[in-house]
């Protein structure tokens, strides 16, 4: 019962963090777009955020294994509060270069915060589900991932609304205060021992020695790179500059998209028939859904290129893309926990989400470059190429896992 209570506390803290993270992303994007930043310059604002995610997940997995989930979770919340306060001191009289460096630093802190919090919440699931209960594990992973994205979408909307009503500075102060209260409450309720490994992990163990986890991590790099290469900068800027949408419209639309995407993730287990061993059917479904996602992305790219009812094509295409991507993401998030041992779950999850952050970093960088060079179509072509690579590696998971099982017999 105590484990369940701890899981609820960790999840609630992560939900609160996610709401501010989504709002901050939209605040920064919209605020600096109004200041005249180019698509590539907007992308650079998030580069350190994503880069720090790569490093944080590696080290955070080791910290969680050695010192417990409480330390990593509270550290993440505290760093996000600090990041929000720092950004509120941004001065329009500063030079462009100094302002950029200042925002990069604050965003870097936020990137560390986000991945410490996420790694903590994902690891906590494995600690409360019995080893053989694969179906429950999948459902809890899907529920957490889906609710996280739904709240991030709500955060996008919140960011747009706060920017319109309160302005940049007061919006940041409001979020920092709310998150600080959540930090105090979580510190009071959580025991220090949650998530500590019985064996003291060495720092070199942050790199996975498991072939299936390595392959899944590579697939994750390209899967999330494909999403962010057109979603982070290209799509919002296209909606603002080409379709002349307002800030509220862009924030609201992206919020609804992510909320819908999160809802689909939550219900993904109902679309997948569970296998007794927890992976055989799931691996086949993962490959099939990757192929479907590639076809959907190809259709969107062709529709935008030939200018076939651009707004409608984009709206329906985004709905289909979000649905397929949500199922793929939920499957991959489940598989990493299925492949992990309970005693080193934070190490495995940390390594895997380091790959996830690397994909977002690559996608964020390419989003600004591709859009500036070739527009939305160019960003979609890059996304499709990355999805094809992710599909190939996903298809390699089955043979890799079978070889591992054969060696253990």
Where are the predicted features?
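Helix-loop boundary and gating motifs at the non-cytosolic
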Residues: 2-52, 214-257
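Hydrophobic core of transmembrane alpha-helices in multi-pass small-molecule transporters
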Residues: 15, 83, 96-117, 311-327
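Transmembrane alpha-helices of Major Facilitator/SLC transporters
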Residues: 53-55, 252-277, 293-296
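Conserved MFS/SLC helix-loop-helix module at the cytosolic interface between two early adjacent transmembrane helices
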Residues: 55-92
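Helix-to-loop junctions at the C-terminal end of transmembrane segments
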Residues: 56-69, 163, 264-282, 371
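C-terminal ends and interior cores of transmembrane alpha-helices
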Residues: 78-96, 291-307
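Cytoplasmic helix-loop-helix junction between adjacent transmembrane helices
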Residues: 106-148
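C-terminal transmembrane helical hairpin of 12-TM major facilitator-type secondary transporters
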Residues: 282-332
């Amino acid at each position: 019962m105590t484990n369940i209570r701890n899981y609820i506390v960790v999840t609630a803290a992560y939900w609160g963090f996610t709401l501010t993270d989504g709002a901050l992303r939209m605040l920064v994007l919209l605020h600096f777009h109004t200041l005249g930043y180019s698509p590539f310059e907007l992308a650079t604002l998030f580069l350190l955020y994503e880069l720090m995610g790569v490093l944080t997940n590696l080290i955070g997995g080791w910290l969680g294994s050695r010192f417990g989930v409480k330390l990593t979770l509270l550290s993440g919340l505290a760093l996000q509060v600090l990041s929000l306060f720092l950004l509120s001191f941004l001065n329009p009289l500063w030079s462009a270069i100094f302002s950029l460096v200042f925002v990069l630093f604050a965003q870097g802190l936020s990137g560390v915060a986000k991945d410490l919090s996420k790694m903590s919440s994902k690891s906590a699931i494995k600690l409360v589900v019995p080893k053989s209960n694969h179906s429950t594990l999948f459902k809890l992973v899907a529920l957490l991932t889906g609710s996280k994205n739904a709240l991030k979408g709500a955060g996008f909307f919140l960011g747009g609304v706060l920017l319109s009503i309160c302005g940049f500075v007061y919006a940041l102060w409001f979020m920092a205060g709310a998150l600080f209260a959540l930090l105090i409450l979580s510190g009071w309720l959580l025991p220090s021992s949650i998530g500590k490994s019985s064996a003291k992990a060495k720092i070199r163990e942050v790199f996975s020695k498991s072939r299936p986890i390595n392959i899944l991590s590579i697939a994750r790099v390209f899967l999330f790179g494909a999403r962010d290469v057109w979603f982070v900068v290209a799509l919002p800027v296209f909606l603002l500059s080409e379709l002349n949408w307002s800030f509220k419209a862009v924030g609201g639309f992206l919020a609804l998209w992510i909320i819908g995407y999160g809802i689909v993730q939550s219900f993904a287990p109902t679309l997948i028939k569970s296998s007794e061993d927890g992976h055989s059917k799931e691996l086949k479904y993962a490959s099939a859904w990757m192929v479907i996602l590639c076809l959907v992305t190809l259709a969107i790219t062709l529709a935008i290129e030939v200018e076939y009812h651009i707004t409608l094509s984009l709206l329906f295409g985004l709905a289909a893309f979000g649905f397929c991507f949500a199922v793929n993401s939920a499957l991959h998030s489940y598989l990493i926990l299925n492949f992990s041992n309970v005693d080193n779950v934070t190490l495995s999850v940390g390594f895997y989400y380091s790959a996830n952050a690397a994909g977002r970093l690559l996608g964020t960088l390419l989003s600004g470059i591709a859009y500036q060079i070739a527009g939305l179509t160019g960003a979609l072509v890059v996304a499709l190429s990355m999805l094809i690579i992710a599909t190939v590696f996903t298809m390699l998971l089955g043979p890799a896992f079978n070889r591992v099982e054969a060696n253990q017999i």
